[in-house]
């Protein structure tokens, strides 16, 4: 089997979710390192930390592909003053490349939000919110994306049954909600991560429920018996992103070793 360069893996990811799909504030794509080396393995994760770089070293991976960019804002210096800079230094010392697939992967057909919908068993998937039309720089073809995904359950379910389904599928102990709907739920709109900006779009699209990772206190008000709000946690909502990344790499770069990170990088703790 032929060797595969790191650049080929990153190119495959960016063909699937072109960088022009990302939000203007984002910093997806190559973050650290040189890409001409043969890939020894790809470690797939949500966040890059020093422990994740150590994991890549221990597993023989010279490429880390994260969902969230390690470098989100410009660095004024690279020293040891914070975890971002220390992580960059450690990666460079060990010839490890870091790339991120963030809002471009959220917005792509078959991306993060599609994976969430798949886990819930939704049918008739389509985008809601803003529709994005961009040109794929690699192919020159027009690509469609969107902010969130909406779909239907095969059979409607009660609000409390939806809560139980979310707890089971995303392995969470609790779900934050507004008042439970007294009607059945068939159509659900969703957005992994911080998706509260799409609540009004979900209502306009006719959704019975809206699922996301986080919302602020005041955003829950005023929607009683209008739409079922379900908030499961930012990290929890995006936990299956690594499966999306693995599927892309295994399809386009067969033979490349893919390792799903075993480190829980969720910075939020839950105590009971």
Task: Enumerate the language-model features and the residues they cover.
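Hydrophobic structural segments
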Residues: 1-272
């Amino acid at each position: 089997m032929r060797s595969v360069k790191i650049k080929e893996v990153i190119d495959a990811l960016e063909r699937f979710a072109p960088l022009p799909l990302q939000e203007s504030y984002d910093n997806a794509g190559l973050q650290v390192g040189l890409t001409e080396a043969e890939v020894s393995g790809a470690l797939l994760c949500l966040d890059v930390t020093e422990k994740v770089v150590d994991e890549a070293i221990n597993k023989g991976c010279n490429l880390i592909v994260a969902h969230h960019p390690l470098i989100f804002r410009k660095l004024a210096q690279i020293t040891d003053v914070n975890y971002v800079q220390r992580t960059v230094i450690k990666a460079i010392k060990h010839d490890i490349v870091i790339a991120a697939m963030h809002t471009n992967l959220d917005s792509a057909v078959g991306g993060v939000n599609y994976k969430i919908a798949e886990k819930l068993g939704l049918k008739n998937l389509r985008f809601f919110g803003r529709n994005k039309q961009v040109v794929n720089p690699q192919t020159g073809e027009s690509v469609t994306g969107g902010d969130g995904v909406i779909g239907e359950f095969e059979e409607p379910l009660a609000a409390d049954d939806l809560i139980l389904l979310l707890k089971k599928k995303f392995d969470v102990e609790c779900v934050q909600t507004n008042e439970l709907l007294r009607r059945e739920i068939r159509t659900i709109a969703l957005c992994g991560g911080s998706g509260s900006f799409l609540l009004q779009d979900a209502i306009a699209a006719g959704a019975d429920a809206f699922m996301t990772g986080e919302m602020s206190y005041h955003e829950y008000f005023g929607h009683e018996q209008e739409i079922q709000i379900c908030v499961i946690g930012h990290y929890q909502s995006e936990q299956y992103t690594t499966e999306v990344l693995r599927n892309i790499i295994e399809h386009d770069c067969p033979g490349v070793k893919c390792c799903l990170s075993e480190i829980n990088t969720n910075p939020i703790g839950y105590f009971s």
